[in-house]
Regions:
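Generic detector of intrinsically disordered, low-complexity, polar/charged segments
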Residues: 4, 50-52, 64, 95
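Mature, soluble, non-transmembrane domains
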Residues: 58-134
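N-terminal secretory signal peptides
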Residues: 7-59
């Protein structure tokens, strides 16, 4: 189970795997990372970059397939992810079961939280504690 939190907003999604996607604010290219929920950690399992550019170095060992760089992240398992939500750039998307949704849409009231935070709210993704959901 994946928990999302921002300020007083909480949501739980019945997911054991998901893709986090976003568009680079300068280069306008899509990034995608596949994650698995494993116990109390998030494990990065694969990633794709649809181009390169400023601050977007292609990792060693990446393979180019149909114009997309594919690689396996070397990042260790994480207890959670902190993502900045701003109305000034395209937001993150959470994809599962072949469907993508804006991450902020999964937390109704996110626009108000972002406004109260001066346009720079944080969304936390982490495994839900076992037996506990918001």
């Amino acid at each position: 189970m994946l928990c999302l939190a921002s300020g007083s907003l909480l949501a739980a999604l019945p997911l054991t795997a998901f893709t986090l996607a976003w568009t680079h604010s300068i280069e306008k290219t899509r990034w995608e990372e596949d994650w698995q929920v494993r116990g109390r950690q998030l494990l990065p399992v694969a990633a794709r970059i649809r181009g390169s550019g400023a601050g977007m170095e292609i990792p060693a060992g990446a393979a180019l397939k149909d114009g997309v760089w594919h690689y396996v992240p070397t990042l260790p398992p994480q207890g959670g992810l902190l993502l900045r939500h701003s109305p000034y750039v395209a937001g993150y998307e959470l994809c599962a079961d072949g469907r993508c949704r804006p991450l902020a849409d999964l937390l109704p009231g996110m626009a108000e939280i972002s406004e109260n935070a001066g346009g720079n709210a944080i969304i936390e993704l982490k495994p839900c504690p076992e037996g506990k959901t918001p």
